[in-house]
Amino acid sequence: GIDITGDSATVINKGNITVTDKDSVGVLINGDRATFANTGHIDVNNSATGMSITTSEGAISQAGSMNVGDFSTGMALSGNNNSVTLAAKDLNVIGQKATGVNISGDNNAVDITGNILVDKDQTATNAVDYFYEPSIGVNVSGNCNTVSLDGKLTVVADSELTSRIYADFDGSQENISGLVVSGDDNTVYLNGGIQLVGEENQLTDGSTVASNRNGYGKTPVITVDGKSSVYLNGDSTINGDLPLAYSGMIRLKNSAMIEIGADATINMQVDIYDHYARSESQMIFVESGAELVNKGDIDTRNIGFAAISGENSTGSNSGNITLSQYNYGLLANAGVGYFTTKGGSAVNNGTITAKVMEQESVINLGASLGLNEANTFYSDANSMMGLDAFDHGYVSNESGGSIEMYGRGNVGMLAIDESTAENAGQITLDALWVDADDTTTLRSNIGNDARSYGVGMAVGTNTYSGPRKNATVVNKQGGVITVYNAGIGMAAYGASNTVINEGIINLEKNANYDSSLGADSLIGMAAYKSGTAINEQSGVININADNGQAFYSDGSGTILNYGTICVNTNCLTGNDYNETDSYTSLLYTGGDVITAQNETQNLTQKASINDKKEGNVVNSGSLSGADIAISSGELVNTSTGTINNAIIINDGELSNEGSVAKVTLN
């Protein structure tokens, strides 16, 4: 081809360039301040390179289209401070282990106005051998480079299927990539959106790779590794046939950042979709200090939006995220808006909406599959979650945020295992909502436990792994949880797991109300398996539905009510209400006397000692009956006092000068 060495060279080519000899190069330029312009078509194959340019302060332009075949590179640019314009209508990467554009060096500016397609030719004789070897559309390495793509970046992923066997994948999906960015301070603008297209059984004989049963592959349209930024705009889509589902369409790590713009959309319209024997995944993975910012409109089916993992990894939403759940298979739930773990965090200032579009998609994990999904609150009716913090995760629904859940088995916010969830915005739950076009019915093994309808905020899990520990969710002052018809406002499962209401919980009914619903179907706060539910002094529970009740405990849980309960317009606060509800504990704080000397009292419901007010709680008489828990502060049993109740010290003190029957230090 063309071989130029030396500085300030100028090459203008108007013809086509075809490079097919092994390891050959169509245009080779080595020297600074080079100028190269080509208006013809470039076709490379067989380990060839269309343009290999090593220059600094150069000007490179390509106006013709480009096809890149096996083991080849369309354009390889190395050097600093170059200006590159690729005005080709199409850049097609169709070969095995091929790369469309490879940019290395620093401070290069690359402007691509056409479309980029990465679609390995699965009819090729070597397609099976390189099924798991990815081809790449654009590879950027180095620092401070700027890349702008005005067209659409499309990646096509093939899935090869075999016969279904129990609890194993239905086949294998290829590995393939769109944009790969490494290094620091690179900036990429994807103005035309991205597209992931699925297809199936494109290999002439895919039985070998299908029998590997690897499930979905690595199909990232965008991968960023390093402190670089990607700005995604335009309309993005996921479509075609994805019989093994997909995962990680966007992957960020090591302080990378992606912003999905305010005018951007991501929509999912698939023809075939299933992920049998594999739980739902996420569209975007963020780890090791990376950041995801969503300002756009996201509409997904049966896949979570983003997983945020690792210290200083963050996600935020000020746009709209809609999760839709269809019956694509036994294990095909729509997942989570934001899932955080291992120090990752996410905040919502926008709207997250989850809709069960087909009732049959609600799964009883244990009964239907015998599976254990550790990040699920209630495995007997599993659907979607708005925000989920698991294993040292943190999520927050800010004052401007809204989480809306429609259909059975949903949880607005969940915290499990040393995790925290906080709400200062709006959470709405309508478990009896059914989509107007839904022709399916609920599975027979989905029961009528209040948890099976849905929960606004929850801690813990009832899965086989155990409830985990030290998880906390708080409905903060200003936060509002509204539950229509059936379900629970806040629920705690497991010892050391706590839900706290400082805001408002509304129990309401609407047009979906079912008058046959009985007791324990619509609950403000509930505690299971030694969990704790606290309605603080600022907390209010409004009950405006016939089947509504403020509290529920399975007998092991603890309910502490310091706040106000309103049934229609009749409101009671603290012990004035607690004395009417056997699920709650009687509250004693500094200055209170349980029994005076020579008095006798039998407690018919649990009691709790706290330090809401200064001073000690004193007992000088004879006391029996239900358990007494010391949550904070000090209980003083004087020399004339006798306590026959079981005393449980959680976090406080007992000073005994009299007689006590049983003391347990928790």
Residue ranges of predicted features:
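Glycine- and acidic-residue-biased ligand/ion/polar-headgroup-sensing regions
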Residues: 615, 633, 652
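Cysteine-dependent hydrolase recognition
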Residues: 5, 30, 78, 104, ...
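Conserved acidic
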Residues: 416
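Beta-strand-rich solenoid/repeat architectures in extracellular/passenger domains
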Residues: 8-23, 33-47, 57-71, 81-97, ...
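Short aromatic-glycine motifs in intrinsically disordered, low-complexity regions
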Residues: 284-286, 339, 494, 527
